[in-house]
Amino acid sequence: MKNDVISPEFDENGRPLRRIRSFVRRQGRLTKGQEHALENYWPVMGVEFSEDMLDFPALFGREAPVTLEIGFGMGASLVAMAKDRPEQDFLGIEVHSPGVGACLASAHEEGLSNLRVMCHDAVEVLHKMIPDNSLRMVQLFFPDPWHKARHNKRRIIQVPFAELVKSKLQLGGIFHMATDWEPYAEHMLEVMSSIDGYKNLSESNDYVPRPASRPVTKFEQRGHRLGHGVWDLMFERVK
């Protein structure tokens, strides 16, 4: 499995300016289980980065709606969603190999055939490998909020990124985001509301209740116990 992780920053026209990452590499040490999963299940469920567009029917062996999850962490919610929706296909992207290993192990244990994973930067994957108008949904749950003002430019939700996601969604496709940091939720709302071609699915034109389709993570459960809020945003591509 290759692990060449990079992420470009864009100018106002969406062109890469220079290399800047929206994440911090925290590879950590692989557990024996994660290492075993990477060695044994990656050949079946893993997708290497290339500069060739993916053919989803060929990748999954069928025609089905495809959901892309960016930054799936340890993969618990992604595996749960793939298990609950066998009629759909799921592609997850995560830059940290322990998380990829954990996700592969869980997916194998559940016997999933509708899940594939990548270990690469999602921005480059979107540019180079995801065909336009091909995704039913893009999910971005709890991305790094980059709390300090001087680091705000590292937040993955910026206008060029949201435009890029829109180009990959089918007409009627959904971009679903969630964060537990209210200033980032406000930033997401401002960015998404500024882009022509997206429709906010919130009745109050801000946030939506957590949909049943998004599992509550252990991290989120802990936050609830501590009184922390979570904000979900869902925007539909309408043109």
UniProtKB/Swiss-Prot annotation:
Keywords: Methyltransferase, S-adenosyl-L-methionine, Transferase, tRNA processing. The active site is at D144. Substrate binds at K148, D180, T217, K218, F219, E220. NCBIfam families: tRNA (guanosine(46)-N7)-methyltransferase TrmB. The keyword Transferase applies. The lineage of its organism: Bacteria, Pseudomonadati, Pseudomonadota, Gammaproteobacteria, Enterobacterales. GO terms for molecular function: tRNA (guanine(46)-N7)-methyltransferase activity. Its EC number is 2.1.1.33. Pfam families: Methyltransf_4 (PF02390). Catalyzes the formation of N(7)-methylguanine at position 46 (m7G46) in tRNA. The keyword Methyltransferase applies. S-adenosyl-L-methionine binds at E69, E94, D121, D144. Belongs to the class I-like SAM-binding methyltransferase superfamily. TrmB family. Residues 150-155 are annotated as: Interaction with RNA. Monomer. This is tRNA (guanine-N(7)-)-methyltransferase. Transmembrane segments: none annotated. Pathway: tRNA modification; N(7)-methylguanine-tRNA biosynthesis. PROSITE patterns: SAM_MT_TRMB. GO terms for cellular component: tRNA methyltransferase complex. It catalyses: guanosine(46) in tRNA + S-adenosyl-L-methionine = N(7)-methylguanosine(46) in tRNA + S-adenosyl-L-homocysteine.
